[in-house]
A protein has these predicted regions:
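Glycine- and aromatic-enriched membrane alpha-helices
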Residues: 1-457
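Positively charged, small/polar-rich N-terminal and surface patches that mediate targeting and assembly
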Residues: 401-405, 420-581
Length: 581
């Protein structure tokens, strides 16, 4: 006989865990740049939709299809007998619950590899995680495998879900390499802020809410007083650890950086949730407090370590949240377990090193297996598909190149649609993309120059010798343009992000299959004032830097300047320009 209350509770937990996908999507989108928002939303949708059939086909069977030491069994499409699980809920309810857990492990990886991963590659490795990686690790810990038989304890997935996803996230981010512009030539990291902190915060609130289903639902039961008491403790410990971790992270960043860091504090909330997940059923509230306390410190130190020392670029902090705190939460069981629901009490509760040793053994072996398998998967993907997108795609944004989406925010293009989706044709292609081989006519067509007529200024003088050069260019060309101007000796420039209305013929971005006619396109306007340096040299350097062989590469305006005043010193004209050229 099935228990109706247990069935309902498990389904509620499953639905909450499913809704975590929305939280992850908002977090990742908010903590990254706007030009990749559509790509991130697609990834978080597709890892669940790809993982669900994969887990049904063989994943669930590998995880729960038997009690073998290494794998459960090979049971395609879940046709076998699962009575050995001893469930008092329908099998399909349990399958739904485990499916959403599998999806969570897969979606964790998305954040650390954001803004530079080939979308095809993402789909393939998401399938691999759901087919063989997560199920086999899950079998060892939850499905009757060798770790479970040794007494390894992971109530709701600090190790099985978050550590596994975090290890893959770390490996993937390391193999991909950092985003363009993340580190300078000396290895110093540069901040690349996310574009929407509100979305990131909303994602954290959603995840926190859903974690009550993630941890609380893992009891699978509310039918007895004992089950209700344990579930209540699980939910209380979950909330307490997250709250403490959040406070600690806020205070720690306040002391460390001089101001309380918002995005780091949001990560602190998630760190506390991850850390308490393994032991929420076996630690006391005092244990939960200390687990959350350490998690709040660990997430900050981990982010700094991977950013500054390891040079692993993790845009959303997924490695620090899920890997570092998944490891910590799993170890914490061996320290703070009261002995309830574990074979041995933790070290601090008189149980010695037995439980701690089992937890450490489990972490090492699981992580070793995951690293070996996913290293092979990533290498194969890189060889046959390509793991990382080309530099041009990364600079323009994955939305326009991977999905034909000019912007996730209607009316404002975040990616430069002209360069990203250009289809060479008679309207735009000038026939030569190498500036060293292009004719003057081709270069002038790609980057036209407009010069202001010299007016009479005073005393019959037509030209002061000072000029302002205003250059309108594509976002992706800024670094080349800046380098070209610096090589001439121009070090002072004003750079403005501007939006232009219109669309270049030959672009192919669409929304719901319908071509987009008009949008606001992002450009940069670079302005320099020169006197000693030849204005013609500046113009020629800019034309060569911007040229790609298409109409619309840029435009240059040259103006006469009558007077320049440096506010700080009061110097005027030529003297005022000497430290910027």
């Amino acid at each position: 006989m099935f228990s109706s209350i247990n069935t309902c509770w498990t389904l509620v937990g499953a639905f909450l865990v499913y809704f975590m996908q929305a939280g992850f999507a908002l977090c990742e989108a908010g903590f990254t740049r706007a030009k990749n928002t559509g790509n991130i939303l697609m990834k978080n949708m597709m890892d669940f939709c790809i993982g669900t059939p994969c887990y049904w086909i063989i994943g669930f069977g590998l995880m729960f299809g038997g009690t073998g030491a290494l794998i459960g069994g090979f049971d395609p499409f879940i046709q076998g007998d699962y009575s050995h699980l001893g469930l008092d809920i329908p099998l399909w309810v349990y399958i739904v619950f485990q499916t959403v857990f599998c999806a969570t492990a897969a979606t964790i990886v998305s954040g650390s590899m954001a803004e530079r991963t080939n979308f095809k590659a993402y789909c393939v490795y998401s399938a691999a995680i759901s087919l063989v990686v997560y199920p086999i690790c899950g079998h060892w810990m939850w499905g009757g495998g060798w770790l479970q038989s040794m007494g390894f304890h992971d109530f709701a997935g600090s190790a099985a879900v978050h550590n596994v996803g975090g290890v893959i996230a770390l490996l993937g981010a390391w193999m991909l390499g950092p985003r363009i512009g993340k580190y300078d030539k000396d290895g110093k990291p540069h901040a690349i802020p996310g574009h929407n902190l509100t979305a990131g915060a909303l994602g954290v609130f959603i995840l926190w809410f859903c974690w009550f289903g993630f941890n609380g639902g893992s009891s699978l039961s509310l039918a007895t007083d004992e089950a209700m008491t344990m579930t209540g403790l699980v939910c209380f410990n979950t909330n307490l650890a997250a709250a403490v971790a959040t406070c600690v992270t806020m205070i720690f960043t306040w002391l460390r950086y001089g101001k309380p860091d918002v995005s780091m504090t949001l990560n602190g909330s998630l760190a506390g949730l991850v850390a308490i997940t393994a032991g929420c059923d076996t630690v006391s509230p005092f244990g939960a407090f200390f687990i959350g306390f350490v998690a709040g410190l660990l997430v900050v130190l981990s982010v700094e370590f991977f950013d500054n020392i390891a040079k692993v670029d993790d845009p959303v902090g997924a490695v620090s949240v899920h890997f570092a705190n998944g490891v910590w939460g799993t170890i914490a069981v061996g320290l703070f377990s009261t002995g309830a629901n574990t074979e041995h009490a933790g070290l601090f509760y008189g149980g010695g090193l037995a439980q701690l040793g089992t937890q450490l053994l489990g972490l090492v072996t699981v992580d070793l297996y995951v690293v070996v398998v996913m290293f092979v998967v990533f290498k194969l993907i890189d060889k046959f598909i390509g793991l990382r997108v080309p530099a041009e795609v990364e600079i323009d944004g994955l939305d326009i190149h991977e999905h034909g989406l000019a912007s996730a925010y209607a009316g404002f293009s975040i990616s430069d649609a002209n360069s990203a989706a250009m289809v060479p044709n008679e309207n735009t292609d000038l026939g030569e993309d190498d500036v060293t081989k292009a004719t003057d006519k081709q270069i002038s067509a790609a980057v036209p120059v407009v010069r202001e007529a010299s007016p009479v200024i005073h005393d019959g003088v037509y030209d002061t010798g000072m000029h302002k050069v205003s250059i309108i260019a594509k976002l992706s060309k800024f670094d080349q343009l800046k380098t070209a101007l610096n090589d001439l000796g121009v070090t002072g420039m004003t750079v403005t992000q501007v939006m232009g209305c219109g669309i270049q013929k030959g672009t192919s971005e669409k929304y719901r299959g319908v071509p987009v006619d008009t949008t606001l396109l992002p450009k940069i306007k670079v302005e320099v004032i020169v006197s000693r340096i030849s204005v013609d040299a500046v113009v020629e350097a800019a034309k060569k830097a911007l040229y790609t062989g298409h109409i619309g590469d840029g435009k240059i305006f040259v103006y006469n300047v009558t007077r320049v005043v440096k506010i700080r010193t009061g110097e005027e004209d030529f003297a005022a320009l000497q430290d910027v050229e």
